[in-house]
């Protein structure tokens, strides 16, 4: 059965009033390929849809990749590992499998296989707690967090490992203390594990909700997040990406992608970030911080402690990647999910390659001959060139530009994290990596877009040796000029790669559904 009519049918169905609520349940807002897999995950929900819309064959077998019965043919995406296998893989199959387990839905499958009960309920209203290895992801029911001690803290809390003390995290369940204490190896840093918090877990003699101890009962499912730097896009998207991955680890109920959830940030600083709109992809509620609950004993009916931004061998940050592979389906799914939920418009390419140049307004890593570099590109009829300073634009406006860019050019810096939201055929051109060669190269591999950077060291001209604030020369703390001819050569090469990409539209009139998935 052709996929496009099915997707269009689902589109119309999802917009129809009688399909918005299936037995009182609303279908989540997801891109079409995501929605198909969501429905296959919950067959009872799928059975409520007309059979001509749920499809057969490739549609009925479509899966994400972490499911036990998911076949390689049904996966959301298979990694690309061209050429001979290299490194420590013994075969091509082992190379693909290694990448899939390191950075794709295989990683989700591993987390699911590790979920182990730490505190087991006896009766229906009891508490529960289960976690993956090293307490990197946990979820619980009917748990009491005692935040009364925060009122006496003089300092603001961020990256603290002593937010909770002994007996300030309670549940009524059978606690396996030996098992829980055996998972405390990764507590050297606040952002590596939930161990600093869970080491204080203790047992109440009575059910939490009947104990009379709850000052506040939170009925809304809650994600408690320990987050990285909020003003740095690269680091804050470590948070958002791991939150998205955690939705799959927690996907035991059709409400897994529901936005009626509460986000609680594990610090007392007011939450502020230029990227704060991204939380709207996950929750329709205002973000809480510890300041919203301090002084209270808060009982959560359903609480998730999601994957953390700086886990050892984690996702996004500190991700080990086998050589020779790219195109993580999990990273592509994250990109499509955010663009869909934030309703970022898509415009198919026309006759020209769309080039976006990120102009820095910071003290360091400015391009001193910016005008000279861009002049020949602007004079070329093949290119549509725009120069932008993203720090001056709302984040959703930034995404609207990035999503409709074919070549994104910029100096080494957090703004290059926008490569996550480029079209599949696009190229990220890190003008100069400032002697940090792997950060955005690896991120481009994970997302599955082409990557280029400056190679001719004799054709880049630093203003000086660079002066690190703590002393010594440093390539990130100076400004640069570049050879114009070599710059144009690199851009032309990137354009040729884009034009030859199998997903790049060959004609302006070509249906964008062939390259960018239809969305609901």
Curated annotation (Swiss-Prot):
Catalytic activity: L-seryl-[protein] + UDP-N-acetyl-alpha-D-glucosamine = 3-O-(N-acetyl-beta-D-glucosaminyl)-L-seryl-[protein] + UDP + H(+); L-threonyl-[protein] + UDP-N-acetyl-alpha-D-glucosamine = 3-O-(N-acetyl-beta-D-glucosaminyl)-L-threonyl-[protein] + UDP + H(+)
Signal sequence bounds: 1-16
Disruption phenotype: Defects in apical extracellular matrix. Embryos show defects in the formation of the innermost layer of the apical extracellular matrix and its attachment to the epidermis. Most larvae die during second-instar or second/third-instar interface, but some survive until early third-instar. Surviving larvae display cuticle defect and irregular tracheal morphology. Ultrastructural analysis of larval epidermis reveals disruption of the deposition zone of the endocuticle, leading to separation of the epidermis from the chitin layers.
Keywords: Endoplasmic reticulum, Glycoprotein, Glycosyltransferase, Signal, Transferase
An annotated GO BP: protein O-GlcNAcylation via threonine
Listed cofactors: a divalent metal cation
Keyword Iron applies: no
Any one GO CC term of the record: endoplasmic reticulum lumen
Function in brief: Catalyzes the transfer of a single N-acetylglucosamine from UDP-GlcNAc to a serine or threonine residue in extracellular proteins resulting in their modification with a beta-linked N-acetylglucosamine (O-GlcNAc). Specifically glycosylates the Thr residue located between the fifth and sixth conserved cysteines of folded EGF-like domains. Involved in epithelial cell adhesion/interaction with the extracellular matrix by mediating glycosylation of proteins in the secretory pathway, such as Dumpy (Dp).
Top EC class for this record: transferase
Native source organism of the sequence: Drosophila melanogaster (Fruit fly)
Highest taxon of source: Eukaryota
EC numbers on record: 2.4.1.255
Name of the gene this protein is made from: Eogt
Listed GO MF terms: protein O-acetylglucosaminyltransferase activity
The keyword Nuclease appears for this protein: no
Main location: endoplasmic reticulum
Name assigned to this protein: EGF domain-specific O-linked N-acetylglucosamine transferase
UniProt xrefs under Pfam families: Glyco_transf_61
Glycosylation sites per record: 52, 176, 250, 479
């Amino acid at each position: 059965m052709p996929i496009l009519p099915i997707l269009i049918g689902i589109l119309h169905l999802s917009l129809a009033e009688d399909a918005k609520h299936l037995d009182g349940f609303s279908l989540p807002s997801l891109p079409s390929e995501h929605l198909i897999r969501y429905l296959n995950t919950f067959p009872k929900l799928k059975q409520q849809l007309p059979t001509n819309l749920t499809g057969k064959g490739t549609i009925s077998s479509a899966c994400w990749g972490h499911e036990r019965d998911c076949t390689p043919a049904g996966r959301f995406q298979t990694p690309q590992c061209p050429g001979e296998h290299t490194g420590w893989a013994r075969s091509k199959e082992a190379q693909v499998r290694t990448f899939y387990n390191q950075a794709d839905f295989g990683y989700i499958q591993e987390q699911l296989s590790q979920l182990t009960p730490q505190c087991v309920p006896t009766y229906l209203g009891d508490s529960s707690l289960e976690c993956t290895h090293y307490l990197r992801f946990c979820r619980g029911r009917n748990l009491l967090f005692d935040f009364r001690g925060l009122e006496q803290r003089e300092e603001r809390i961020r990256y603290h490992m002593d937010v909770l003390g002994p007996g300030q995290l309670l549940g009524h369940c059978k606690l396996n203390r030996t098992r829980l204490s055996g998972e405390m190896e990764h507590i050297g840093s606040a952002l590596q594990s939930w161990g600093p918090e869970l080491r204080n877990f203790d047992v109440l003699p009575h059910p939490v909700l009947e104990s009379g101890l709850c000052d506040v009962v939170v009925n809304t499912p809650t994600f408690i997040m320990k987050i990285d730097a909020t003003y740095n896009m690269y680091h804050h998207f470590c948070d958002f990406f791991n939150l998205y991955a955690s939705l799959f680890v927690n996907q035991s109920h059709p409400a897994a992608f529901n936005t009626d959830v509460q986000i609680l940030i594990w610090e007392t600083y007011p939450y502020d970030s230029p990227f704060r709109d991204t939380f709207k992809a996950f929750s329709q509620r205002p973000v809480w911080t510890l300041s919203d609950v301090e002084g209270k004993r808060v009982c959560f009916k359903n609480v998730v402690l999601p994957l953390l931004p700086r886990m050892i061998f984690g996702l996004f940050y500190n991700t080990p990647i086998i050589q020779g592979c790219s195109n993580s389906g999990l990273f592509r799914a994250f990109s499509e999910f955010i663009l869909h939920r934030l309703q970022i418009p898509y415009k198919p390419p026309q006759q020209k390659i769309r080039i976006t140049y990120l102009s820095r307004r910071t003290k360091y890593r400015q391009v001193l001959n910016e005008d000279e570099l861009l002049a020949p590109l602007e004079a070329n009829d093949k290119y549509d060139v725009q120069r932008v300073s993203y720090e001056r634009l709302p984040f959703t406006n930034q995404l609207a530009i990035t999503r409709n860019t074919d070549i994104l050019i910029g100096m080494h810096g957090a703004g290059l994290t926008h490569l996550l939201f480029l079209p599949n055929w696009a190229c990220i051109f890190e003008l100069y990596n400032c002697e940090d060669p792997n950060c955005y190269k690896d991120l481009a591999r994970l997302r599955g877009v082409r990557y280029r950077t400056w190679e001719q060291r004799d054709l880049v001209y630093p203003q000086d040796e660079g002066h690190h604030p703590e002393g010594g020369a440093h390539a990130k703390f100076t400004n640069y000029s570049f050879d114009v001819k070599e710059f144009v050569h690199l851009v032309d090469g990137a354009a040729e790669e884009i034009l030859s990409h199998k997903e790049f539209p060959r004609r302006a009139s070509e249906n964008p559904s062939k390259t960018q998935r239809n969305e609901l």
